[in-house]
Amino acid sequence: KYIGGPSVADKYIRSLGIQQFSILITEDDMHQDLSACYLNWSTPLEAARLLEILLTRSLFKDEYQEFLKNIMIECETGKDRLPQPLLKTDAVIGHKTGISDLNAKGQFIGTNDIGFVLLPNGSRYTVAVFIKDSNESMETNAKIIASISEVIYKYFTESYN
């Protein structure tokens, strides 16, 4: 509502070259009708691409881009997800978690985490892990995301060192 509604957000993100996603409704709409949650979606790859654009293009004033990066680095939620395997490393992670309500089948509609990792060697990667319609517990979903994060971290640290 602050930028003109879902259609304005959708159009702007498409103007950046991101295509495999949809923003049709607001967060409030989704909380009022859980089945509507499926109207807003993105592939993990497109979400990671959008984050990469945010990190590398001048979309806003520098101070606002730095603010967004720092807010992600300071994120306190979901430390058992993407950040978990990085906690005892020198890597810096910025991330944003997402969690949904349960659907009519009692499944978590979505458990997500998207972020960027700054490695000690100066390289960076972006990552997005989305779990949809999960019958697993929140703890198990977090472990799944953490294990994927660990595989990616090992790939980058072992491939580039």
Name each model-derived stretch.
Residues 1-59:
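Mid-domain, small-residue-enriched loop/turn segments at the edges of structured enzyme/sensor domains
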Residues 2-3, 49-81, 85-91, 100-161:
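Structured C-terminal helix/loop/strand segments within mature extracytoplasmic catalytic/sensor domains
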Residues 30-39, 90-102:
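Carbohydrate-binding/catalytic loop surfaces
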